[in-house]
């Protein structure tokens, strides 16, 4: 169900829009994704697969639409943001807190993401297509912040799951 809702529906929407010639010449389509499509995040699981597929669909249709109608199709990789879909992510609140602390600019809010989408729909980005654009306060470019290094240095004891199995990483 996750793949259907978070990826295949995007493909179907673009496919129908193309058949019905529903997107204007020079138009713009934007879908939201998350860095877990390219990195490993505990608890993200199926949603990470769906977001990877979503980004691939955007690139594929971006080429077709770009050549045929000068339409731009991009994805925006947003900071962890409280959403209905996000409620299914294990420890979402901890992920949001961690990302906010790791990001030099902090997490981008839903309102800031909406502003970024408006820019992507404008003619200011008429040559931007088939891209996954990060809107995450710098989180996607971070390796390890000083704050995280200091915290980890205090306690690097093994982490055990509910069955007592040690989890590394």
Task: Enumerate the language-model features and the residues they cover.
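Catalytic loop of short-chain dehydrogenase/reductase
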Residues: 1, 23-67, 78-82, 106
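Non-catalytic terminal and boundary segments that flank Rossmann-like NAD(P)-dependent oxidoreductase
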Residues: 20, 26, 146-169
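Short beta-loop-alpha junction of Rossmann-like oxidoreductase domains
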Residues: 79-91, 143-144
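Glycine-rich NAD(P)-binding loop of the Rossmann-fold in SDR/ketoreductase-type enzymes
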Residues: 1-9
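C-terminal helical subdomain
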Residues: 8, 12, 75, 93-128, ...
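Structural signature of the Rossmann-like NAD(P)-dependent dehydrogenase/reductase core
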Residues: 6, 27-34, 72-77, 129, ...
């Amino acid at each position: 169900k996750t793949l259907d809702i978070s990826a295949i529906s995007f493909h179907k929407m673009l496919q129908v829009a193309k058949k019905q010639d529903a997107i204007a010449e020079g138009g713009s389509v934007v879908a939201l994704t998350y860095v877990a499509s390219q990195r490993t995040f505990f608890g993200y699981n199926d949603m990470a697969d769906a977001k990877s597929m979503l980004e691939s669909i955007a690139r594929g249709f971006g080429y077709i639409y770009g050549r045929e109608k000068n339409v731009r199709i991009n994805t925006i990789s947003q900071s962890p943001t409280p959403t209905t879909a996000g409620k299914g992510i294990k420890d979402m609140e901890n992920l949001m807190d961690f990302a906010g602390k790791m990001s030099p600019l902090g997490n981008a809010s839903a309102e800031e993401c909406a502003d970024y989408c408006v820019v992507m729909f404008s003619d200011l980005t008429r040559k931007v297509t088939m891209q996954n654009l990060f809107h995450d306060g710098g989180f996607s470019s971070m390796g390890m912040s000083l704050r995280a290094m200091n915290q980890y240095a205090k306690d690097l004891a093994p982490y055990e799951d509910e069955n007592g199995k040690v989890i590394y990483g």
